[in-house]
């Protein structure tokens, strides 16, 4: 699930929204959830950007003489002989993702700091450190199967291969309610825009056609912008659930689920592993 922020959220707005949905018949864990959201503007979050970014090209079979290259030569070749990684730079990643992640985090009620403001961060009583420990950009081929039933009689299919780009993020996070750093992980991917279909000619032969729009740098940058917003929301939700777990012996949240707070509507939702950080 995704949150959209147009401006920093005020405590008055949160109070009005949550007050309309939290009542006595609600599950017990909504009480601490409400408390966390209403008091989240007292939590200071230090965001530490990643020191370096990994670029991994899994299309090694396209690199001539790959197996005979040294480890250093392989790293150079994997980036240079790629569709997207050859165009990506650390600066693009920082502008499209890291800086945007920090921005979207400031649009919540959390107080967000970066290392140059460490002296201000330390003056807060409730502190959380979010270290973007590792960022990895992967490029590879993904298999897509197109299927159809011809004349309502038999199944035909074709396996096509499309370019794929994956963004992997490892986060080390402490919270005001747990001093031990927890390693969190999230990843998402995009591929070429692919459309494949089957047609039958006059002779009864089944023909396969496909139309692909290849991934480009602009789509990757837009993708990273969206992930920055999504992962900022994951961070808020992680701190929310951490607080609930620290205040209740049995939070009673369904297995494999976490609580998500939608700031626009002021409502809480259950989310599965596809919409949150995964603990490692």
Model-derived features with residue positions:
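Short secondary-structure boundary motifs at beta->alpha junctions and helix caps
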Residues: 81-88, 174-246
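A structural "domain/chain start" motif
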Residues: 25-106, 244-280
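Bacterial N-terminal signal peptides
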Residues: 12-24
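Bacterial N-terminal signal peptides that target proteins for export
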Residues: 2-13
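Mixed-charge, low-complexity intrinsically disordered segments
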Residues: 58-90, 142-164, 192-211
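Solvent-exposed loop/turn segments at secondary-structure junctions
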Residues: 52-54, 136-139, 190-191
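Short, solvent-exposed, polar/charged sequence segments at loop or secondary-structure edges
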Residues: 90, 94-150
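Surface-exposed short loop/turn segments
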Residues: 123-186, 271-280
């Amino acid at each position: 699930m995704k949150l959209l922020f147009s401006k920093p959220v005020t405590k008055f707005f949160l109070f009005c929204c949550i007050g309309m949905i939290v009542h006595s018949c609600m599950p017990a864990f909504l009480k601490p959830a409400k408390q966390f959201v209403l008091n989240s503007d007292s939590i200071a979050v230090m965001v530490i950007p990643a020191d370096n970014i990994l670029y991994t090209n899994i299309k090694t079979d396209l690199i001539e003489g790959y197996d005979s290259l040294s480890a250093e030569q392989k790293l150079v070749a994997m980036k240079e002989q790629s569709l997207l990684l050859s165009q990506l730079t650390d600066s693009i990643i920082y502008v499209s993702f890291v800086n945007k992640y920090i921005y979207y985090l400031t649009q919540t009620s959390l107080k967000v700091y970066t290392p140059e403001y460490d002296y201000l961060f330390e003056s807060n009583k409730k502190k959380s450190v979010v270290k973007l420990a590792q960022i990895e950009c992967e490029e590879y081929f993904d298999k897509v199967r197109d299927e159809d039933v011809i004349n309502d009689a038999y199944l035909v299919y074709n396996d096509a291969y499309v370019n794929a780009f994956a963004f992997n993020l490892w986060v080390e996070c402490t919270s005001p309610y747990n001093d031990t750093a927890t390693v969190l992980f999230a990843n998402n991917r995009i591929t070429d825009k692919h459309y494949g279909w089957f047609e039958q000619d006059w002779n009864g032969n089944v023909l396969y056609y496909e139309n692909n729009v290849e991934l480009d740098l602009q789509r990757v940058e837009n993708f990273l912008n969206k992930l920055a917003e999504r992962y900022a929301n994951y961070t808020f939700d992680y701190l929310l659930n951490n607080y609930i777990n620290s205040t209740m012996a049995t939070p009673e949240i369904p297995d494999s689920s976490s609580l998500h707070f939608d700031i626009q509507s002021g409502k809480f939702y259950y989310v599965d592993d596809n919409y949150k950080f995964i603990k490692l």
